[in-house]
């Protein structure tokens, strides 16, 4: 008894749901035994409603019969609903009723709309349909909309055909006007452009601005109309100064290749061949000796080149004897040095002509070709043509002497320049050596300064590290003192709790002893029921005492460890 009184009493546990249900059933059916109530609860899965119904059936047989009838009817209903065919029929019926309700709810609004539409718009001549007579089944989307769509498509197709015919008529008219313009252009070109002998770059640009060339004609879509090939390129454009800078004189195997190189390819070749002037063209010599084509506003097509070549062959066959009206002269072959000198003479001649005339450029026009010019082109000579006539050829000797003198002067100037360059190179080398020395001296100064800075930095870092260590030691000592104070306070708290727990245990033991004495005197029949509870209380008290003792020991050990660690620090 002393051990039982020493153990504290455990708190009461909250009742479970099963206990609550058992208590409610006991209140509802006080005459039934506890064993029956527990059995019914266990059979119903500890659910209150089915257990209540079962106990009610035990007490009242009429209620049991009613419950059986209700269960049989419910089972029949579930069996009927389980049939898939019956279920589908029921769902269809429900869906049909919902649709009928919706349709009937919107019927008056639909009738009002149809009546208003019929008042606003006049009656149309449309084919009668079976749905027109039924006022209730009338719908705009099913009856009127297809008719409107059909009429709209027919009107659109007719409009499309008319517009296509109108466009074709306009195109045919424009084709006829372009044919007339082409005929006028090829019949009388002198009205549009001036003669090649009097033409200049300014006049050509003004003529191009007044009437630019027409674009290439498109092929007609209908049979019967004339098909004409485009005489020019699809994208004509005016030539700039940059285009003329790349033009040079060259000698080629045929006049067709010469013309293609001058007009389309624009290849840059050494100016060492004779000037092959073509009929109808004019060339401009600028101050640099570069040749510009004055009337090459449009690029020639291959068909034009072939026609020109055929005309030259016919002229060659017709004319077998040379005439006196030629201005081109055939010059005998010379070595490579004579070619270069003759090429230089072109520049000198152009400068003299520019000085005499006080103009920026001089236009050299080519006369119609005779047999001598054709022979000159056929021989494929690489010698330059110095002038237009024999008088120009006689002056080439003097010009060549002048050029030789100029070349000698230029060589002397080059030698002087080479000497000056060597002197500059020697000066540059000396300057570089002095610069290298200055750079090395600066580097040595910088390295010395860096070493001094590094020493001062190392000293500063050492002092900083010492100060940081001192601060860390101070903070560690403060932390140890704080920990010791905390451990002391914890020990005091533990002692106070122990004393409080001892006093509480004494009080509880006294009260328990009094209560047990009263209970023993009052009820002897309850001893058998209270023995297992007391055993449970003893075990629980023993476990609680063990746990409390372990917790106290652990706290004491932790406090001792903290004290030891504080002493060590």
Curated annotation (Swiss-Prot):
Biased composition (Basic and acidic residues): 79-100, 234-249, 329-340, 367-381, 399-500, 507-558
Domain CUE positions: 17-60
GO annotation terms (biological process): signal transduction
Subcellular localization, as worded in the UniProt entry: Cytoplasm
Chief location category: cytoplasm
Location of region: Disordered: 67-139, 175-275, 311-569
SMART domains in the record: CUE
Low complexity: compositionally biased ranges: 250-274
Biased composition (Polar residues): 347-364
PANTHER family (alphabetical): TOLL-INTERACTING PROTEIN
Protein name: CUE domain-containing protein 5
Originating organism: Schizosaccharomyces pombe (strain 972 / ATCC 24843) (Fission yeast)
Lineage: Eukaryota, Fungi, Dikarya, Ascomycota, Taphrinomycotina
